[in-house]
Amino acid sequence: ATLYIGTVLLLLPMKMPYREESTAKDASPLSNLMEGMNYIFKKRVMFRLMLLNFVRTGVFAPLLLLLPAYTSEVLNAGPGIGTAMMVSMGIGGVTASFIMSSWGFFVRKGLVSLITLCTGSMVFTVLGLSSWVALSVGIMIIMGLSQSHFIVSNQTLVQKVVPDTLRGRVSSVWHYEQGLIPIFSLVIGLTAGLIGMGRAMTIYGAIAVLLGVMYLLIFKDIRELD
């Protein structure tokens, strides 16, 4: 909470020399949402960026919610191992933040989004196959690196592509996808109840890997974004 308050205080002295008059107040929230959705569906690059984030939300985001069941059923371990996995993921995320803030991206941001979607999905798949605690804990560092790089690169490209007048509307749609996390978690959980957590994670991870590789091959316009 202190860090959030500190961030807000640091934003207060910022000066914004350029600003366009907002048009959102002239319409209802629903019409603003529909306007953002229409823009996303009409502009192919934006739709593809949103699609990548949709897959990321469906695979990466539910992982933390699944850890208690995963550590108990797949690893036959206690809650301490789940905590260790979360810590490892946090280490990866902080490391990614340090790398991006210090040196930026070493390749184009669009390519970063596509590659990290694949690597994060691979981690999800490996976790489903793993029964080795050390592997499961260690590989979460890669998940943290992948997720942080994906979110920053994908969101940066969204902000770069969208016009100023629609930035708030489109960003809202991007964040609305976070509301789907409980649904994705429910689907994975129900599948795990039928075939086991390990198999469910392996299947969902493999599907995400296939989608990621397919997007990497066919989304040339995304690969070239920087």
Show the residue positions of the predicted features:
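Juxtamembrane intracellular "pre-TM" segments in multi-pass secondary transporters
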Residues: 17-51
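Alpha-helical segments in transporter systems
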Residues: 48-57, 174
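Helix-loop junctions on the cytosolic side of multi-pass membrane transporters
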Residues: 3-27, 217-226
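C-terminal transmembrane bundle of multi-pass solute transporters/carriers
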Residues: 3-5, 34, 41, 60-226
